[in-house]
Regions:
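Long, low-complexity intrinsically disordered regions
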Residues: 1-222
Length: 222
């Protein structure tokens, strides 16, 4: 499938709705990422006066909020989008591989904290879970990534600091939540077996990525 060149957040939303799955950056499959299909002037650029501009990066919050869709580190520990149509199957398969963590485990404690507090930006959740010492940030991020890969945590939105002129700046912080809290338990329920969900996803990805090898697609599904 040849993907259209994308010039706007609206165009990206339409494509995600059409194909169901879209990694943000390099996916390991040539041409299959949001970065690959945006128009050249929507890519990352350094500004002459300092700073940077990256329209694609700024679209993420709009896409997640307005579609809506799921966003998180779903693809080989890298971020991407999944439409609500395909989320139940993806969730069904991934959770069969990664059962809900025990509440006594670190990952279980992180998930319970987020469920009890509601949405939190990453640093707030990290502090609430006691990961405040030296070197704790990277350790905490690895636990978060595992929970995102397992579909228990997603990004609800992106929060940006503002300068004295009330302009947003920086890379932004992920506002984290559980998919159940955002869209209800039914959004994560599927009437197929995990194997049936896997085969359905595999067949779909083969259709939209005819040049990708089976190994590449298997790696993408996880």
């Amino acid at each position: 499938m040849k993907f259209p060149e994308i010039y706007s957040a609206t165009g990206m939303m339409e494509l995600i709705q059409q194909i169901g799955f879209l990694p943000l950056l390099d996916s390991g499959i040539e041409g299959f990422s949001a970065e690959d299909i945006v128009a050249e002037d929507c890519g990352y650029v350094r500004l002459p006066e300092g700073g940077w501009d990256w329209p694609l990066w700024k679209w993420k919050g709009e896409i997640v909020q307005e579609m809506p869709c799921m966003y998180g580190k779903f693809f080989n520990k890298k971020a991407g989008f999944i439409s609500q149509e395909w989320w139940p199957d993806f969730c069904n398969y991934r959770r069969s591989k990664y059962p809900r963590p025990d509440e006594e485990s670190i990952e279980g404690a992180i998930l319970c904290t987020l469920q009890s507090t509601g949405s939190l930006i990453t640093r707030e959740l990290r502090a609430a879970c006691g990961f405040t010492g030296k070197g704790m940030r990277s350790k905490f991020d690895s636990y978060l990534t595992r929970l995102e890969m397992a579909t228990y945590i997603v990004t609800e939105d992106f929060i940006y600091p503002r300068d004295k002129h009330n302009h947003k700046y920086g890379w932004g912080w992920s506002l984290l939540n559980t998919p159940e809290d955002l869209y209800g338990r039914e959004a994560c329920q599927c009437n197929r077996t995990p194997e049936e969900s896997y085969q359905r996803i595999f067949k779909h990805l083969k259709e939209i990525l005819p040049d990708a090898s089976d190994i590449q697609i298997i790696k993408l599904i996880g």
